[in-house]
Amino acid sequence: MTEVSAPLHELVLEGALEAPLAAHISILLDAGLPLTILAIESPLRQRVADAFAATLRHASSVGHRDEIFVESDHHFEWLGDPVGIGCMDPLAGTNPRSVRTVLLRVSGLVGGLEPGCARIALRSLARGYQAIIEAQAPDLPALFDALRATPLRLPEDDLQQLGVVLRVDTTRVLAAHLLHPSVGTVRRPPTLLTNWDASAGRWDDFTWAALPAFAERSRMNQAKYDAIHQARMTILGTPASR
């Protein structure tokens, strides 16, 4: 299945997330944005992470990337060289890695990783590394509070590097936000992309308001972005509504 993995297609068919949002996220991942998935305890968190990682491997526009798993039992040391990272984990090797050849798979960002490892893993995002991150947090404000607090004490600019943030429960995506990197002293609030309305049993979709940002972050003009999004929608088996 070109450009979209079978696991992602299955999540859409199960109703875990909508096809338009899945297509948008897959394009943003192709462009190098990080993806962060939040939940307290839910197998869906890892399923979503694995599905988008598989989709990134399918992308014809993205070259091969080594997936480096940053987990609670791994102790990483990162080199200061801005063109590469060094991992003291024997499974990942110790040679510096280019930004273009690495995908970090960060698990246990809050309450799992050793604080120093978590800080350095997030700091690497500002240096251009891409990551798919799983974090134990009920929502985005709680994640920010945990990352600001002791022992992590991450600066605000690092918090804005988390890319697309999904909040999930055991069955579906409940909310999605797009974060915006700081520009100088200017910090933009997160953009709400979708929110699950439990009383109506449907998602409230706000991605239409973020289309210019999607195209800009993907380094495309709007027409090209819309065409690629339409193609992904077709692959996912759902006609585009916009």
List each language-model region with its residue ranges.
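Hydrophobic residues embedded in beta-strands of well-ordered beta-sheets
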Residues: 172-174, 203
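Short acidic (Asp/Glu) and glycine-rich catalytic loops that position anionic groups and cofactors
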Residues: 2-6, 123-127, 196-198, 206-208
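Switch/coupling sub-region of P-loop NTPases
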Residues: 33-40, 49, 53-169
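ATP-binding Walker
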Residues: 42-44
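NTP-binding/hydrolysis catalytic cores, primarily Walker-type P-loop NTPases
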Residues: 10, 182-242
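A glycine-rich beta-turn/hairpin centered on an aromatic-Pro dipeptide
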Residues: 174-183
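P-loop NTP-binding catalytic core
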Residues: 1-34, 51-54
